[in-house]
Amino acid sequence: MKSLIKYIFSLLVFVIFMSLSFINFYPEKLSKSLTNFTIERNQKSLSINEDEITVFTIGTGSPLNTSRVQSGTAVFIKDKFFIFDVGDGVVTKAEEMNLPLNELDAVFITHFHSDHYIDLPYLINRSWVLGRNKDLNIYGPEGLKNILDSNYDFLKLENKHRVDHHGSEIMNTKYAYGVSNEFKIEDNKKIIYDSDEIKITAFNVDHYPVEPSVGYAIEYNNKKVVISGDTKANELVFEMATNADLLIHEAILNSLLKNTVKILENKEMHRNSHIVHDIQDYHTPPNEIVKLANIANVKTLVLHHLTPSPDNIIINKLYEKQIKDFNGKVYLAKDGDKFIVK
């Protein structure tokens, strides 16, 4: 037995030595293989069934934590690729997930808090740099056009440098900027996208004083996915989510944050305490989401924009305690999770 262990150990040492020697003396050959592997990996297309809706939670965090990417959700239907909200880190995470940003068709913004749109200029630019050769339609409530007009000036020099370097045939500035599809909702909800059997309805939510704020209902092939946006418990969300196959809803653990406020006050961190106190009145606790989702007959519930994020066993248990009574499948989403609506 000892002889066998010595033999295995010696073999491992030999393999490690030879590997390090090869790396040291033949880095060019290895770099070619590595480059080839990376390109082939990045060229692999996502496996999307045209009868299904495929959803990725790119970012599931909130401004209160840095361990997760901020809000961002990718939706694939047939040959269409949409992203809903583009918070900090969404673009980088999307590339890590190998999502084909060069094929992006449209972006939908729920409201203008930075954790939902701060990466929008980067997404517009990055998808173009990666080869997007079609318009990128941006949908959002009032205020969107001003943001995109400012983004034109923000990216103008960057885009000029790209064209000067690579030429206009490679870097066609026709597609370098997002196309504004700003909308105003007159009667609580409005169909803003209706093409190729895909219908997307924007609807008002209650995130006061942040107005306008909206959620989105996505319908295709008798399937429905609803994204709540940021909101306190809102009956319209669950009206839109009635019989939904998938509801993606923000969540906040108010019970934990109330204690956090007291701790911050005791430490004389008054500014932080004030902010943590204020955010509790325009988000939704998990137990309220579960109650209303059960009434709406939601099949699968996914909680994201988790405040705080359940990245340790204690916080995770606090969430689980509040969602245990949901009648269907329920998930505390993580960055990079995938959900398929069949």
Listing of model-derived features with the role each one plays in the protein:
Residues K2-I23, G215, K224, K232-K334:
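Cap/insert and terminal regions of metallo-dependent hydrolase folds
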Residues K2-V226, I315-V341:
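Binuclear metal-dependent hydrolase catalytic cores
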Residues L247, V341-K342:
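Short, solvent-exposed mixed-charge patches
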